[in-house]
């Protein structure tokens, strides 16, 4: 019990230090996701990375409307729901509190093995966040590489103790081997789960519904049934609870005791642990629902002349959505009290690698924040409502795209296809940086395209040439169908139906997953 109490006190202290700036020293006025919880959520999300080859095949048919609700998750959850002993696992590699790797298991290799192949001796002094407790085969190599800390999600481990296909004896022997490796290594193998700060879940729910992607749907299709977002969220919650939680409390206690967490099996530690896990799953489901697989919406080329040319070069919609959710999670680390923005950069190599992400590999990520090392009172925090332009924040905030480029862990290679996913349209300050860095594709919302605000403008994005732009919109082919059947108008270059009399549309209800 003493160990459990010390762990909670330690993590509470860490939570207090990591809820703010890039240096973790500021306390803001809005709820913020701690870095530990961000890394944990990203590890869970990486476990759900779409199977690349299957998605490329499915992308050719993704407009036929054959999938049920949340059809984009069928392939993502196939491996996790399959009754196999080795569970698919997501992994986040962190060095100096910066993400340097996002990985997931492949058909041939575990996540820990992939990390060794990709990073090698560079894993020394890194922190690793697993979506499941790693097996002994992975742990021995990771420990040998000199990692600093290994954190894992305290549910069913990588060698499953729950599935019918697992050999109970083999799984327990592996768990014992893991404990022996843990007790005899210098690496700290632990559970890092922090309670969410006050009102965090409520804040995420409100901002997810108001985000550009959901609002674009409601603006483009004004006759939409607005319950679609909440229905999507409920489906995601059910799905993720089945994947990442152990519904039976006694079974959960048995797993915890088997994997060396018997000190967490007594209340209040056990009930607190389960509540923290449920809260994080709710948050993940909420954010994932903000970029939904809905009707014919997705990331498409805005220029009709380039649609046929660029289609074969674009990512499958499921992968594009997955990467955008990564950026949405990053946005909850923002230091901007008004607008949180997240950005993540990926690249695609010439050939498929051993990673579960296929040929794609992580390059860098960021969120909008004040300069590294700054304190809360060092810079102004006022927005354009402040008449005195000298004390506004816009001259001091580092944009998400800028942080992603600055702290990238890989070089951007001109011969490879690189892509950046941004939760909002890149502004005029960032567009030339993205092009100059050699990034080939931009995935973003287009709600602000062509707008000029008090302190920031979005004029260059629409005029940008030499970089493929895929914005969140109704599939242009579907928009063309609307053009043939209904009056239309254009909003940011996208066909939009003109609202008709309410009685003409009262029977039209949008359905989830028809994509």
UniProtKB/Swiss-Prot annotation:
GO cellular component annotations of the record: cytoplasm; nucleus
Domain CMP/dCMP-type deaminase: 71-169, 318-483
Lyase in keyword set: no
UniProt catalytic activity: 2'-deoxycytidine + H2O + H(+) = 2'-deoxyuridine + NH4(+); cytidine + H2O + H(+) = uridine + NH4(+)
Cofactor: Zn(2+)
Alphabetically ordered keywords of this record: Cytoplasm, Hydrolase, Metal-binding, Nucleus, Repeat, Zinc
Biased composition (Basic and acidic residues): 60-83, 486-515
Enzyme Commission numbers on file: 3.5.4.5
UniProt enzyme class: hydrolase
Molecular function terms, GO-annotated: cytidine deaminase activity; dCMP deaminase activity; importin-alpha family protein binding; protein homodimerization activity; zinc ion binding
Annotated PROSITE patterns: CYT_DCMP_DEAMINASES_1, CYT_DCMP_DEAMINASES_2
Active-site residues, record numbering mapped to chain: 401
Amino acids binding Zn(2+) 2: 399, 427, 430
Binding site for Zn(2+) 1: 110, 135, 138
Transmembrane annotation, as ranges: none
SUPFAM superfamilies: Cytidine deaminase-like (SSF53927)
One BP term from GO: cytidine deamination
Function: Catalyzes the deamination of cytidine and deoxycytidine into uridine and deoxyuridine, respectively. May play an important role in testicular development and spermatogenesis.
Family the entry assigns: Belongs to the cytidine and deoxycytidylate deaminase family.
Name assigned to this protein: Cytidine and dCMP deaminase domain-containing protein 1
Taxonomic lineage: Eukaryota, Metazoa, Chordata, Craniata, Vertebrata
Gene of this entry: CDADC1
């Amino acid at each position: 019990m003493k160990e459990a109490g010390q762990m909670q006190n330690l993590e509470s202290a860490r939570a207090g230090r990591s809820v703010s700036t890039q240096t973790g020293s500021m306390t803001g006025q809005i709820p913020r996701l701690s870095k530990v919880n961000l890394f944990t959520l990203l590890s869970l999300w990486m476990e759900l990375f779409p199977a690349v080859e299957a998605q490329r095949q499915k992308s050719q048919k993704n407009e036929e409307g054959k999938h049920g609700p949340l059809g984009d998750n069928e392939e993502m959850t196939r491996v996790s729901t399959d009754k196999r002993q080795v569970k698919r696992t997501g992994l986040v590699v962190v060095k100096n509190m910066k993400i340097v790797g996002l990985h997931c298991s492949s058909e041939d290799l575990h996540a820990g093995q992939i990390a060794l192949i990709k990073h090698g001796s560079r894993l020394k002094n890194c922190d690793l966040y697993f979506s499941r407790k790693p097996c002994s085969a992975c742990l021995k190599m990771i420990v040998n590489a000199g990692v600093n800390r290994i954190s894992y999600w305290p549910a069913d481990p990588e060698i499953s103790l729950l599935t019918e296909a697992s050999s109970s004896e083999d799984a327990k022997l592996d768990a014992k081997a893991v404990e022996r490796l843990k007790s005899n290594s210098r690496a700290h193998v632990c559970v890092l789960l922090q309670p969410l700060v006050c009102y965090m879940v409520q804040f995420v729910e409100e901002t997810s519904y108001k985000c550009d992607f959901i609002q674009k749907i409601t603006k483009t299709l004004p006759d939409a049934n607005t319950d679609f977002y909440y229905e999507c969220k409920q489906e995601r919650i059910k799905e993720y609870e089945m994947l990442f939680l152990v519904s039976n409390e006694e079974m959960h206690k048995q797993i915890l005791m088997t994997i060396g967490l018997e000190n967490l099996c007594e209340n209040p530690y056990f009930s607190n642990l389960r509540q923290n896990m449920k809260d994080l799953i709710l948050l993940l489901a909420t954010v994932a629902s903000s970029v939904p697989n809905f009707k014919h919406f997705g990331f498409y080329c805005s220029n009709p002349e380039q649609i046929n040319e660029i289609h074969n070069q674009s990512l499958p919609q499921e992968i594009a959505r997955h990467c955008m959710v990564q950026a949405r999670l990053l946005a909850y680390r923002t230091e901007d009290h008004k607008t949180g923005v997240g950005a993540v950069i990926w690249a695609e190599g010439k050939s498929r690698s051993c990673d579960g992400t296929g040929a794609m590999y992580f390059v860098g990520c960021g969120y909008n924040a004040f300069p590294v090392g700054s304190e809360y009172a060092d810079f102004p925090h006022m927005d354009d409502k402040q008449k005195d332009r000298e004390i506004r924040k816009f001259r001091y905030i580092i944009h998400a795209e800028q942080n992603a480029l600055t702290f990238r862990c890989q070089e951007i290679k001109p011969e490879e296809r690189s892509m950046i996913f941004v939760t909002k349209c890149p502004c005029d300050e960032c567009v030339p940086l993205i092009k100059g860095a050699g990034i080939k594709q931009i995935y973003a919302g287009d709600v602000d395209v062509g707008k000029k605000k008090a302190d920031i403008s979005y004029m260059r994005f629409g005029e940008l040439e030499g970089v493929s732009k895929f914005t969140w919109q109704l599939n242009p082919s579907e928009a063309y169908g609307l053009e043939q059947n209904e009056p239309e108008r254009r909003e940011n270059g996208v066909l939009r139906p003109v609202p008709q009399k309410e009685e003409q549309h009262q029977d039209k209800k949008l359905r989830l997953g028809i994509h």
